[in-house]
Design a protein with these regions (language model features):
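Zn-dependent metallo-beta-lactamase
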Residues: 45-111, 157
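Conserved small-residue-rich
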Residues: 12-13, 82-130, 134-143, 153
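Metallo-beta-lactamase
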Residues: 112-116, 121-124, 137-138, 160, ...
């Protein structure tokens, strides 16, 4: 049961884990649902717990009474992943139910190019925040499960180029029932492919036949370290307590 207080998780939770990795001091898991195990205390914990509510793909995190801090939290996205180590990599929030809560990222490169990695659910507030950063020039889709609202984002940013592997491109009559046939750059073969200097797409089949990871070298991330965006097939296992691979199906 949810801890007594203003914040709670309702029965619409789909157990995607978003809130639990974002704010583990507030959210936990019971059976196949998340719940509030401890009400947040202090402005820092409250902001993180509310950010998880914004990111929740099903809007399952609610409040008993209006939360004064919520407006500022909504306006805080995109959130830095690690301002010291990866100052140009951000968490977009606004996870989509159609991608089962997959995490979307933003890479803001030194030349002014902004790349989304996997699509969040569409939000006009997030779109305005992205416009203030110069818009979005690339949408890098790791695989077919995580395309979410890519069509609506393309409508908002018409010059944006979407990228995914041709083996994962589907029409609206196939899982996940989202039309991908209009994706501008459909990668063929085994790669790797250069998106931009310092940004490569690497074919990593397994989770799906067309799964692709995107490697951004250190200069693009603004630090001494690069970033590898892997989609769903590489994850942290809470059960095992370590990094692990999702089940291989089409290696």
């Amino acid at each position: 049961a949810n801890a007594r207080g203003n914040l709670f998780v309702d029965e619409s939770c789909i157990d995607c884990d978003t809130c639990r990795w974002m704010a583990p001091s507030t959210y936990g898991r019971a059976g196949t649902k998340s719940y509030v195990h401890t009400q947040p205390e202090g402005s820092g914990d409250t902001a993180i717990a509310l950010a998880a509510a914004v990111a929740c793909p099903t809007g399952s995190i609610r409040t008993q009474a209006p939360e004064p801090a919520m407006r500022g939290v909504v306006e805080s996205f995109p959130l830095p992943i690690d301002a010291a180590r990866l100052p140009r990599v951000f968490h977009l929030g606004y996870h989509a139910a159609t991608s089962f809560g997959a995490t979307p990222y933003l890479l803001c490169m030194p030349d002014g190019t902004n790349a989304m990695v996997d699509a969040p659910r569409f939000s006009s507030k997030l779109a305005k925040a992205l416009e203030a950063r110069g818009g979005v020039q690339l949408l890098l889709l790791t695989h077919m499960d995580d395309v979410a609202d890519h069509i609506r984002w393309k409508e908002r940013f018409p010059a944006m180029v979407r990228v995914m592997h041709a083996r994962d491109v589907r029409g609206p009559d196939s899982w996940p029932y989202i039309d991908m046939r209009g994706v501008e750059r459909q990668l063929e073969g085994a790669g790797p492919w250069e998106m931009l200097p310092g940004l490569r797409a690497i074919h990593t089949p397994g989770h799906s036949a067309g799964s692709v990871s995107f490697l951004a070298e250190a200069p693009l991330c603004g630090s001494a370290e690069g970033a590898l965006f892997t989609g769903d097939h590489f994850c942290f296992s809470g059960r095992l307590g370590r990094l692990d691979m999702s089940s291989s199906t089409l290696a």
